[in-house]
Each structure stands twice: as structure tokens, then as C-alpha cells.
């Protein structure tokens, strides 16, 4: 079997799908994208295709190493996202050829279900509370919400009080009937992270995500030393080499590699194993589409330390398409009591509606994250 063609499709709301075709008619799908940089990743995919056309798709490990090591410059969000989507598609092909789901090819199940959590938007506490109530009706009891709006490098007590007030009202409204993580989104400087984490501790969030930017990872162990709240990070780390430094330094309790950013299934399985050796749990980052989610689920079901799975159903970014709009076998992604079951169809287990993908790709928007500014008009982290 040989790879004959690689096609990319930019899609709403902010996704990109990839299709790998073979001379035997077996097709694999992947999801390579950096949100807001889809065209750049698309160019990288087609540059990497020179290494792939005419090659045997079953040699996933060799092809991964070629894509990573053949170029003198490597790593980073763009190249690793391109590799990630290609890697997902190669695993999809292998599973279809062998008539087995990817988790079966990786040694079989380590669990029968995985807890999912849902992102909750809203600028006011009442809006967040209403959103949680709606999601509880469909089975969720675990959530993630923004921990704050933009904060200055050193900000005032009013900004801190506003962030804490939202969390306090949520805990008061639901008590211990729900769990929630707080996403700082890298918006918070190290000095302000110290202040905010201390103020939030009485409300017992499940975790705090990206307490500071990955570029400031040296602060993770320092922040962890002052709190009992587990710290989470990883969506802006792109290879096992990035994660190696964080694991060695300590401070992070939950790793969040993104299966569409950090080298795909091949790389993230290695990252999961590294984390387990440090007694660090895994909660793959996934605010993206169905192929990315499927890839995450296969890792969850073969990784002992996987504890939570993010998913983008109903997320506020999903304008123009929802999580399962391009999927034929929607029922396979159904959750029971807030848990996903293993996908059982061969490969990734996602049946893509290719005709719909082609149609929607004709007018795909170029999504960009907002540009925020502080009161003094300097740029703020989003």
C-alpha cells in the first residue's frame, strides 16, 4: 500500500481536516490546526507531503521521525500541528486495514469509560450559573470556565475581587454537586497568579489551567508550592521535549497535551507515559473538532493516568458548525452520565461526511482570536 494524495479542508468554526488517500482505496482522516493559523499549518502539511507521497502508510513510526527529523529546524506549534494531523490519519488507515480501533492496536483498554467535562462561557456570574444548569440537564457534572478576564502585570484589588466573586457565586449555587476547573489562559502574570490562586483556594476548584504562560514554566513549581489546588498545563507545549522540562521541574499535576498540536497520537502516547512515571495525570486538551476528539479518546483509553477529557460540544467558539456536524456516526460519540465510551469502529472510529466537508470548506472563515488591550492601550493576553 502506498500514499497517493493528501488533501486539506479548512472548515468552520476554526478547524482543518486532512485526508490521506492510498492506492488501495483506504482513506485516513486527521485534524491538523492551530486555531487562528490554519493557513500556515496547511502550508506546512503540504510541504511535509513530499516526504509521504509514495510511502507505505503502515510505517507510522518511521514516517513520524522523517517528518520531525528530516528538516534541520523542527518543533514548534506549526510543524508539530501539521505532523499531528498526518499522524492521526496514518493511525486511521492502519486501524481500517487491520479492522480494529486504534486503542486495540495500542494494547487494548485500560478503562471502560472516561469522564468528560464541558466548557462554560459567560461574562457575568448569573450567565455562567445558567450555563451550568443547562449542561447539568444533559448529564455533565464537571466543567471548565475562565478564571478571569484580562489582568495587568500588577493589577488592582477590584480585578481580583471580580474574578473571585464569580467563582464564589458558582460554588455557593451548586455546592459540591459539581466540579470545575479554572482556566487562567496564560492571561495572568506570575505575581498576579500568586495573589489570585491564594484568593481562590477556599472555593476548591478542581484545577487551575495555564496559571502562567508556558514560556514562564519556571514558575510552575513555585506556584504549586503555595497552593493545594492542582495546576494544569500543556496546550502550548508541542513535543515530549517540551514536556520533559516541565515534568523534571515539577509543579504540574495535570498534563494537557493537544492531540492536534503535539505531534498526534504517536507523540502524545509517549507524553502520557512520561507523565505516568512522574505520577502526573493526563487530561488531553481538545476545544476542536471530532477527529481531534477521537484521537484524544484513543489515548485516554490506553493511558492509565488519563482522568478527564475536554470536548467542544456547544463551546462559544463553534460558530458555523458544531462538534458532530461533519460526522455520520454521531451516536458513537454519545455520552452516558457525563462519560464517553470507547469508539469501536476501525481506525479512529469517525465516519466523516466528506460531501459536507467539501461544501463547507468552500467558504471557510479565517478565525482569529480577539485582540485585547489594557486600559493604557498596551496589548493584553487573550
Swiss-Prot record:
Pfam families: MR_MLE_C, MR_MLE_N. It catalyses: D-galactonate = 2-dehydro-3-deoxy-D-galactonate + H2O. Keywords: Lyase, Magnesium, Metal-binding. GO terms for molecular function: galactonate dehydratase activity; magnesium ion binding. Its EC number is 4.2.1.6. The keyword Metal-binding applies. Mg(2+) binds at residues 183, 209, 235. InterPro entries: DgoD-like, Enolase-like_C_sf, Enolase-like_N, Enolase_C-like, Galactonate_deHydtase, Mandel_Rmase/mucon_lact_enz_CS, Mandelate_racemase_C, Mandelate_racemase_N_dom. The record marks 258 as: Increases basicity of active site His. This is D-galactonate dehydratase. It comes from Escherichia coli O1:K1 / APEC.
Amino acid at each position: 500500500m502506498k500514499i497517493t494524495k493528501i488533501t486539506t479542508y479548512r472548515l468552520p468554526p476554526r478547524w482543518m481536516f486532512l485526508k490521506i488517500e492510498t492506492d488501495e482505496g483506504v482513506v485516513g482522516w486527521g485534524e491538523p490546526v492551530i486555531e487562528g493559523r490554519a493557513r500556515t499549518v496547511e502550508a506546512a502539511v503540504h510541504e511535509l507531503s513530499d516526504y509521504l507521497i509514495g510511502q507505505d502508510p503502515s510505517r507510522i513510526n518511521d514516517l513520524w521521525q522523517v517528518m520531525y527529523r528530516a528538516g534541520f529546524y523542527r518543533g514548534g506549534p506549526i510543524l508539530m500541528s501539521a505532523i499531528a494531523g498526518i499522524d492521526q490519519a496514518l493511525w486511521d488507515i492502519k486501524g481500517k486495514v487491520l479492522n480494529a480501533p486504534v486503542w486495540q492496536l495500542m494494547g487494548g483498554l485500560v478503562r471502560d469509560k472516561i469522564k468528560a467535562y464541558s466548557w462554560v462561557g459567560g461574562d457575568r456570574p448569573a450567565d455562567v450559573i445558567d450555563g451550568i444548569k443547562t449542561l447539568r440537564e444533559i448529564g455533565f457534572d464537571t466543567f471548565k470556565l475562565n478564571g478571569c478576564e484580562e489582568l495587568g502585570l500588577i493589577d488592582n484589588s477590584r480585578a481580583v475581587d471580580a474574578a473571585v466573586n464569580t467563582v464564589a457565586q458558582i460554588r455557593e449555587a451548586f455546592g459540591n454537586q459539581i466540579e470545575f476547573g479554572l482556566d487562567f489562559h496564560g492571561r495572568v502574570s506570575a505575581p498576579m497568579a500568586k495573589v489570585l490562586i491564594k484568593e481562590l483556594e477556599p472555593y476548591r476548584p478542581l484545577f487551575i489551567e495555564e496559571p502562567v504562560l508556558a514560556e514562564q514554566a519556571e514558575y510552575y513549581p513555585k506556584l504549586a508550592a503555595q497552593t493545594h489546588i492542582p495546576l494544569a498545563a500543556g496546550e502550548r507545549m508541542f513535543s515530549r521535549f517540551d514536556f520533559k522540562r516541565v515534568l523534571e521541574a515539577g509543579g504540574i499535576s495535570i498534563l494537557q497535551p493537544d492531540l492536534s498540536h503535539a505531534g498526534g497520537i504517536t507523540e502524545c502516547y509517549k507524553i502520557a507515559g512520561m507523565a505516568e512515571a512522574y505520577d502526573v495525570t493526563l487530561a488531553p486538551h481538545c476545544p476542536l473538532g471530532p477527529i481531534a476528539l477521537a484521537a484524544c479518546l484513543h489515548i485516554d483509553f490506553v493511558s492509565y493516568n488519563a482522568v478527564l477529557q475536554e470536548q467542544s460540544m456547544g463551546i462559544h467558539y463553534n460558530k458555523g458548525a458544531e462538534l458532530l456536524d461533519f460526522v455520520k456516526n454521531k451516536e458513537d460519540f454519545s455520552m452516558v452520565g457525563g462519560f464517553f465510551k470507547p469508539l469501536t469502529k476501525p481506525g479512529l472510529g469517525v465516519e466523516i461526511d466528506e460531501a459536507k466537508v467539501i461544501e463547507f470548506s468552500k467558504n471557510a472563515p479565517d478565525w482569529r482570536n480577539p485582540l485585547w488591550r489594557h486600559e493604557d492601550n498596551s496589548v493584553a493576553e487573550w
